[in-house]
């Protein structure tokens, strides 16, 4: 019995006792040590007896018995012979499952290069030997010789020789030198390498070389060599002499009926290798001619290549049915590979699926589960109950009872199911709310019933959706399901912290209908004592639901000690609102109910309820809201009839007026007054305006009706038209859809996004004619095609986001940093896009928040800003707050709770162990399908409007200018001479109200700090040209302006005025190439004038295309334009919107024409030009001049002699995030990405908290490039995790050494995922082969930090409830490392006790083992 316990312990050797997974190269000895014997024959099994052939690929002697505890010839059977090796057939008597783990090997007759290290770019073998891949392949595939030992000859080591050269050399030097071909040669070269010496020489070379490319190459080699030295891998192991053979049960051979076999492709590949290997051995024994042996060796190399990675080199080897065979590499990579198919996505037992239907009578925490399904899912529980209650004697009997469906079974089922939560999941599970727990209620029928309020979270509807049910089996699982996943615990959305349990559709319509008011309804003006009486009046028909009445309302308000005190008022309200008040929980104000409730208002109700009263009350309230909404929606009798779509009378006038305008434009076009493009834009403008007017007329018509009030006077009230009510309440439909039903359909788009100029003037009520129908099919199909593509793209974006962020978990409470990012309200132009309180809500303050203008601390640092504190911020009109952020968090391999702030789905500071990375990825990815795929082509109409030419303020306040340089012109107005000037309006409290960018050359009517009033124009400029502004007064002097050489004269036909146009350098004659036309300002005597305060001459160089209207010697005053540079219109560019834009931002892609930013601060000048580029020089105050070549066609925003700051725009365009990071730092790039991503989502009306985007940005910024390594373990130019550098720097700071210098690097999410520390995570994401090759050569260790790695090795994830488990393991590991050196010895008594506790059941091991053990026990 003792042995048995030991045996079982050995059998169930847990996979828990490892903390790191290391990957490396296998040495030949290691492969032999894994092996249980050599596979010598290609045979698999005997086709008659089906027994494995000896020494073949399925040999029982090597791999273990085919049947449990039975040798092949049948001499030894049963458990008592365990461990015996049969002398007849040589098979060990043991369990058959060892055939899954025992490996074999093949001794190769000639070495073979491993294809991964050869062909996976960059080729590791090539890099080590410093040879091009082509040369290595020529040696390997026997095309040329390579010199291994030159001896006393004038050959070089590693030199290639052709057949002829080799024969010549042999004649000259006989056997002085050694040259070989094939893998032996490569192996010999690798074996003879002295890595340490090689490293030294490379280091010296690195010091002495100056060329950038050489340095890069040397660094690459150096890294590889160092990783070989550190990992203990030997280079020659990249060439194999022994090939491991996979255990046979992992490449099974299955007999099909009809005498054929289904086999794994690997068997074919192995057979091919063995055949060729045996043939080669025979040829070598025979001492066959060289050419034959060589050919055989080459074929062996090819067959091993195919086994390891088929199709990597040459054509893929195909099987009998002409498809390529699946090699070992194919087994693990791709969606169908081991990682993604079996390790990350397993199928789950105890699950079922069915169609869902609506369950309007359920509570929020319940779902209806069909009896049939429940019986099947809870089977084992029922068996146990039947047996424990004595209804069945054995499991078998219980099984029979369940199959017969005896009456008692149903009672037991009800008992088992009570309070046993189940999980419901709807695919696609886009965020964590896609799986929630419910308590099952048994129902008849075959469809699962779902509570209507959770539909929004599941994104479910009842048009045939299916859902899957899973049963949490263990107590822990049930506990987690109840405490964390119950639908009642998921009221708020993790993406934005707003309620996700919001009523929609019928419920909204019912509540809206119930809370509407009506003029002169029946019973208007009644005085009622409370809600009960109001309901009575309604039920008895004394009053209508919408009548305006006075009711006594009792509200409950919390007093100082937090108890509810009743307060009663008489309130003007309606019967319906009074009835609705009956379901309001204590502590809610009546004002929230005393209004017409639309969808937004109802959402606010639930939000308020959650914030004021907590979870339980809110859940009950939400349920009541739903029941009430359904009831009154039924009573309202709203329906859609064709007469509800009222077509406005004005429609036909508006359309005919538009047609006349269009005809007029057409005439202008034909007489040549407008161009074709202008005509098109104007026509589209006209029709768009007409459509708006029709829509407006229609909505006015629909939304109001005139009724007679009690005084007999006509009064307007909101209409009770069903269609209008549905749209107005937010239940279904929108103004845009009603416009198509009762207005006009309007302009249609082609699939490429351009607009068809013939509008559809009809609406759906009138019906479309054939042409109109045809036009509209165009766009409609595009819509469907888009949706299909969008789903896939959005899913892929989510996958990349999850992958980059999966290992980000909250691992400590406070990292103690003082860093943070400064939040200000988001203002664009004159409107506040997002108020400050919305941006800082749920964040932690990084510094004390002071009352503006004083030193009084309002809120101290490290305080979580909740709703109450945000009110304080609002009241004191604070306009910028520094808050902690994930991006600036100092925690090494995770984030701290303080930097993250509030857990949006729970409303308090986030807990440790929360997987914030995955939550962020899901929150960003989940709305992805709602984003458009289109790139918008903006019509001329839109782009003309986009060109602003003035700033008109909307609020009264103080004008503030930042980054400003100006001169004052003779009218006393300011003329800007600075580039990126920003103009802000600040109110009396010092809050920013408006924010504008003002271009160079704008004329300002007010100076900095002056008061302006609302509606006033404070700045204007010409949007089509950029002026060159004179900074001094004087006389113009032309410099190098030669007519016909550098400039041409042009005369305006209409005005007759002539002007000079500067030619582009490329268009000038050769003589004019080096001339640089300029305008110089001189005084009356002709002396140079200097710009005030500098020693710079007032001389303005003119770029190509500049227009000068002044003549030589003309007088100019300060602030007047000397020349104009026409600006090309920017309106024609595509604006990438929607999903592609988000993907571009997260992938940190460079835009097509990036903005050019100043790399350093200094004075701009231009150097010698080349053919297509000009040379920009920036000279700083001290230090060396920076120069950059810029293409001629780029428009520059700077003039010669201008002072720029680092990071200023030199040429317009889209900014590259990499530039922003390099020149303006981490904060700027975070701001940029967050705002740009939010811009896309805001357009679609999707709310996502900034935090989530910051989390992704943190992951994109987790690598750094070492710029100065000193004597640390890093190399210069190496890419390292920032956390690693920080750890090293802390250590160096303690030792008093200089800190390693580094630059943060921004990686796109795909790159960042592949560059993660964990090779398991990277390999399961993309490019599996490359990742594993790199990891193996470097001998990487995977610390199993992230979630993905732990899922793959089959452990609890280090997040959520698994977080504590992992922390304990770490503690125990530290303690255990000291103590656990001696082995624990049990006393005999303990052994006995343990043994007596063992009774074997089918779960312990495989069923047959249990039976056998019990039999063996009986026998003893």
Swiss-Prot record:
Binding positions (Zn(2+) 2):
815, 889, 896, 899
**Record GO terms (molecular function):** DNA binding; DNA-directed RNA polymerase activity; magnesium ion binding; zinc ion binding
Domain of life (superkingdom): Bacteria
Q: Name the EC number(s).
A: 2.7.7.6
Q: Which residues bind Mg(2+)?
A: 461, 463, 465
GO CC terms, sorted = DNA-directed RNA polymerase complex
Give the protein's biological function: DNA-dependent RNA polymerase catalyzes the transcription of DNA into RNA using the four ribonucleoside triphosphates as substrates.
Q: Which family does it belong to?
A: Belongs to the RNA polymerase beta' chain family.
What is the protein name for this chain?
A: DNA-directed RNA polymerase subunit beta'
What organism is recorded for this protein? Histophilus somni (strain 2336)
User: Gene name, please?
Assistant: rpoC
């Amino acid at each position: 019995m003792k042995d048995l316990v030991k045996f079982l312990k050995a059998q169930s050797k847990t996979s828990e006792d490892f903390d790191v997974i290391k990957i490396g190269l296998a040495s030949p000895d290691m492969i032999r040590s894994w092996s249980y014997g050599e596979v010598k024959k290609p045979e698999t099994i005997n086709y008659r007896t089906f027994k494995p052939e000896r020494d073949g690929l399925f040999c029982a002697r090597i791999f273990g018995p085919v049947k449990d505890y039975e040798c092949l010839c049948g001499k030894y059977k049963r458990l008592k012979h365990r461990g015996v090796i049969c002398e007849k057939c040589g098979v060990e008597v043991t369990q058959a499952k060892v055939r899954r783990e025992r490996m074999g090997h093949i001794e190769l007759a000639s070495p073979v290069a491993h294809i991964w290290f050869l062909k996976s770019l960059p080729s590791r073998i090539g890099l080590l030997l410093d040879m091009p891949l082509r040369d290595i392949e020529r040696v390997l595939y026997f095309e040329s010789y390579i010199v291994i030992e030159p001896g006393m000859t004038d050959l070089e080591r590693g030199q290639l020789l052709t057949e002829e050269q080799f024969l010549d050399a042999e004649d000259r030097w006989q056997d002085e030198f050694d040259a070989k071909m094939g893998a032996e040669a490569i192996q010999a070269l690798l074996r003879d390498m002295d890595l340490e010496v090689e490293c030294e020489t490379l280091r010296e070379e690195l010091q002495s070389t100056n060329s950038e490319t050489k340095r890069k190459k040397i660094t690459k080699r150096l890294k590889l060599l160092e990783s070989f030295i550190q990992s203990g891998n030997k280079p020659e192991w990249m060439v194999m002499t022994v090939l491991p053979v996979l255990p046979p049960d992992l490449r099974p051979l299955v007999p099909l009926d009809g005498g054929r076999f289904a086999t794994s492709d690997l068997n074919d590949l192995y057979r091919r290798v063995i055949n060729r290997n045996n043939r080669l051995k025979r040829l070598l024994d025979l001492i066959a001619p060289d050419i034959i042996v060589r050919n055989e060796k080459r074929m062996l190399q090819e067959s091993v290549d195919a086994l390891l990675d088929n199709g990597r080199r040459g054509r893929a080897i195909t099987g009998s049915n002409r498809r390529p065979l699946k090699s070992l590499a194919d087994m693990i990579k791709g969606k169908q590979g081991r990682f993604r198919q079996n390790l990350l996505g397993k199928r789950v037992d105890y699950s079922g699926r069915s169609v869902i239907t609506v369950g309007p009578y359920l509570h929020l925490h319940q779902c209806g589960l069909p009896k049939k399904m429940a019986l099947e899912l809870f089977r084992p529980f029922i068996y146990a109950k039947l047996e424990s209650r004595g209804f069945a004697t054995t499991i078998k009997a219980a099984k029979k009872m369940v199959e017969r469906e005896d009456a008692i079974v149903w009672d037991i089922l009800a008992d088992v199911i009570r309070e046993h939560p189940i999980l419901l999941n709807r695919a696609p599970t886009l965020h964590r709310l896609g799986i929630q727990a419910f308590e099952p209620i048994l129902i008849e029928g075959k469809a699962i019933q779902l509570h209507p309020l959770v539909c929004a979270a599941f994104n479910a509807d009842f048009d045939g959706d299916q859902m899957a049910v899973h049963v949490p089996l263990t107590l822990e699982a049930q506990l987690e399901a109840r405490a964390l996943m119950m639908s009642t615990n998921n009221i708020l959305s993790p993406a934005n912290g707003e309620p996700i349990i919001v009523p929609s559709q019928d419920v909204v319509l019912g509540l809206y209908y119930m809370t509407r008011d009506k003029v002169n309804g029946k019973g208007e003006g009644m005085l009622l004592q409370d809600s009960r009486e109001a309901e009575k009046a309604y039920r008895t028909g004394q009053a209508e639901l919408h009548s305006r009445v006075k009711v006594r309302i009792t509200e409950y308000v919390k007093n100082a000690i937090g108890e509810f005190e009743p307060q009663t008022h008489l309130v003007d309200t309606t019967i319906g609102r009074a009835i609705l008040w009956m379901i309001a929980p204590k502590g809610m104000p009546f004002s929230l109910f005393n209004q017409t409730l639309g969808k937004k208002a109802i959402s606010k109700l639930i939000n308020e309820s959650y914030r004021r009263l907590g979870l339980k009350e809110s859940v009950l309230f939400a349920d009541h809201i739903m029941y009430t909404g359904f009831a009154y929606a039924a009573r309202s009798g709203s329906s859609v009839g064709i007469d509800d779509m009222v077509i406005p009378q004005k429609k036909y006038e508006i359309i005919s007026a538009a047609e006349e305008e269009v005809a007029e434009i057409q005439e202008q076009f034909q007489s040549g007054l407008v161009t074709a493009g202008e005509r098109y834009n104007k026509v589209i403008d006209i029709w768009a305006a007409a459509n708006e007017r029709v829509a407006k007329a229609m909505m006015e018509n629909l939304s109001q009706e005139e009724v007679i009030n009690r005084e007999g006077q006509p009064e307007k009230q909101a209409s009770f038209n069903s269609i209008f009510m549905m749209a107005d309440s937010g239940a279904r439909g929108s103004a845009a859809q009603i416009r198509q039903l009762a207005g006009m359909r309007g302009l249609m788009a082609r699939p490429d996004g351009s607009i068809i100029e013939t509008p559809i003037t009809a609406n759906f009520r009138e019906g479309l004619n054939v042409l109109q129908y045809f036009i509209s099919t165009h766009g409609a199909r595009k819509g469907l095609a888009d949706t299909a593509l969008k789903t896939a793209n959005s899913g892929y974006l989510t996958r990349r986001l999850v992958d980059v962020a999966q290992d980000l978990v909250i691992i400590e409470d406070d990292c103690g940093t003082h860093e943070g990012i400064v939040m200000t309200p988001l203002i664009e132009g004159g409107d506040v896009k997002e108020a400050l309180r919305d941006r800082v809500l749920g964040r932690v303050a990084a510094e004390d928040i002071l009352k503006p203008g004083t030193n009084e601390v309002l809120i101290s640092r490290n305080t979580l800003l909740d709703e109450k504190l945000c009110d304080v911020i609002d009241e004191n009109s604070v306009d910028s707050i520094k808050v902690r952020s994930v991006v600036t968090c100092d925690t090494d391999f995770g984030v701290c709770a303080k930097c993250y702030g509030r857990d949006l789905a729970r409303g308090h500071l986030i807990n440790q162990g929360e997987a914030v990375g995955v939550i962020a990825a899901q929150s960003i990815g989940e709305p992805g399908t709602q984003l458009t795929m289109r790139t918008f082509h903006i019509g001329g109409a839109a782009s003309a409007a986009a060109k602003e030419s003035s700033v008109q303020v909307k609020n009264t306040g103080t004008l503030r200018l930042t980054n400003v340089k100006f001169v004052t012109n003779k009218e006393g107005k300011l003329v800007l001479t600075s580039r990126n000037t920003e103009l802000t309006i600040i109110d009396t409290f010092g809050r920013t109200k408006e924010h504008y960018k003002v271009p160079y050359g704008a004329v300002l009517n007010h100076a900095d700090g002056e008061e302006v009033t609302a509606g006033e124009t404070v700045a204007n400029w010409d949007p089509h040209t950029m002026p060159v502004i004179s900074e001094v007064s004087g006389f113009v002097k032309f410099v190098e302006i030669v007519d016909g050489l550098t400039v041409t004269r042009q005369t305006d036909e209409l005005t007759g005025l002539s002007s000079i146009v500067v030619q582009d350098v490329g268009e000038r004659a050769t003589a004019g190439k080096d001339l640089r036309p300029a305008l110089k300002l001189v005084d009356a005597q002709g002396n140079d004038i200097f710009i005030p305060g500098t020693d710079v001459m007032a001389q303005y160089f003119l770029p190509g295309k500049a227009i000068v209207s002044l003549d030589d010697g003309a007088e100019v005053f300060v602030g007047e334009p000397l020349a104009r540079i026409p600006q090309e219109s920017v309106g024609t560019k595509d604006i990438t919107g929607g999903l592609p834009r988000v993907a571009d931002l997260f992938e940190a892609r460079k835009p097509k024409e990036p903005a050019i930013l100043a790399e350093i601060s200094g004075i701009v000048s231009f150097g010698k030009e080349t053919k297509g580029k000009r040379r920009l020089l920036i000279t700083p105050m001290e230090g060396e001049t920076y120069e950059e070549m810029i293409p001629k066609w780029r428009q520059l925003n700077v003039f010669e002699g201008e002072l720029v700051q680092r990071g200023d725009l030199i040429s317009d365009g889209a900014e590259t995030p990499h530039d922003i990071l390099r020149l303006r730092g981490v904060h700027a790039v975070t701001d940029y990405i967050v705002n740009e991503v939010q811009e896309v989502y805001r357009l679609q009306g999707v709310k996502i908290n900034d935090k989530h985007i910051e989390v992704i940005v943190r992951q994109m910024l987790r690598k750094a490039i070492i710029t100065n390594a000193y004597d640390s373990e890093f190399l210069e130019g190496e890419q390292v995790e920032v956390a690693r550098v920080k750890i090293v720097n802390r250590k160096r700071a303690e030792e008093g050494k200089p800190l390693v210098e580094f630059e943060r690097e921004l990686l796109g999410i795909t790159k960042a995922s592949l560059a993660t520390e964990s090779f398991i995570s990277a390999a399961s994401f993309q490019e599996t082969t490359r990742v594993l090759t790199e990891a193996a050569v470097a001998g990487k260790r995977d610390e199993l930090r992230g979630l993905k790695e732990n899922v793959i090795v089959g452990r609890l994830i280090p997040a959520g409830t698994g977080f504590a488990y992992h922390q304990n393991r770490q503690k125990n590991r530290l303690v255990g490392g000291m103590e656990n050196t001696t082995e624990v010895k049990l006393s005999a008594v303990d052994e006995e006790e343990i043994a007596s506790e063992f009774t074997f059941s089918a779960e312990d091991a495989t069923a047959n083992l249990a039976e056998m053990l019990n039999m063996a026990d009986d026998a003893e």
